[in-house]
Amino acid sequence: MAVLTEKQIKYGFDYYHKDEKQLKSVVEVSEYDSEDKLMISCTQLDEDYSAKDKKRILQEWCSFLVEHPDTFTELMFCTRMLQDLFDAVCAQRRLKRLHIKWGVYPDISKLENLQELEYLHIGAGRSVSSLEPISRLVNLVALSIENFQQIDDYAPLANLKHLESLALEGDFASPKILKVRSLGFLRHMKQLRFFSFLTEKVIDKDYSPILELNNLEHLTLKSCKEVKQLYPQLIKLP
């Protein structure tokens, strides 16, 4: 099982480093050349592609991902993720790392199929309504969730006993913040080494569960009255 590196602790596991080798980016299945790590950009195609070709390209990728379930260990999607494509990605049973920048995928139930997954960034998930599929990814080491506007209870994440890095973010591009009912679930996640909590609001206004994260090496919080009151105790964390 993966363990976070010092670099991942300092910057975050999904931080973009210009000096690191980037994944090959492709549009069509025909560009694939036996790589097990790939960036697929098969949506939001420009006017160089006809409507017919756009539909074909998406369908070809969905079929390929389902029909070749042992192909990839890492996938990145920086263009719009659609539900059909999301479901197809979840057929990749060897996948260890998945990055989804944004999209519309209200049903994430098939994520549960990815039992080898260790690193997951799932962004702009405003239509997602349940955390249960994520809570069943027992091998997750690092998780970044962005803009899950329909969810305020993050207690299911306490089931992730190997999780070392957790980032809960709202929407940086708009005034919408993420509302979290309580941080009480953190009391059951003392293995965390990295915790980032930005553009959010804690409904019960209690940030004290963070003080029980004795293995924490990186902490990022939005400044607010409740955080400022805990500052003398927060700076004593490892």
Regions found by a protein language model. Give the residues of each.
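Concave beta-strand-loop units of leucine-rich repeat
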Residues: 3-108, 116-238
